[in-house]
Amino acid sequence: MSEPQQQPVVKRADDITYESVDAADGMRKGVLLDESDGAPNFAIRRFVLEPGASVPKHTNAVEHEQYVLEGEYIVGIDGEEYTVSAGDSLLIPADVVHWYRNEGDEQGAFICGVPNGDDEILLAE
């Protein structure tokens, strides 16, 4: 007997709910696709950093692949700070301290892909 075939999913922008991120001032997250949509391996999320947003130093148990959609903001990774803008890509390995800060007047936004499953987030400060 063959395995059931995975079904395609098209999720519209209007179907995405954004929620504030705990411990992050001025950041919102919308889950674009994950296990609940039938994606077996990865979740993709869209994060918005409002002007003045600040996300404290923290680690995640899973890697993050990110693509900057809009704006310009600062990402700290393992002790170094980078100013990123639309079109930039980032790899943040698992268990590496990182943080975000939007010092500009415009919102920033990025796509973040992570493996499905549990992710333990630990504040570093």
Where are the regions a protein language model picked out?
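Short, conserved beta-strand element in jelly-roll/cupin
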Residues: 46-50, 60-77, 113
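Ligand-binding loop in jelly-roll beta-barrel domains
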Residues: 94-120
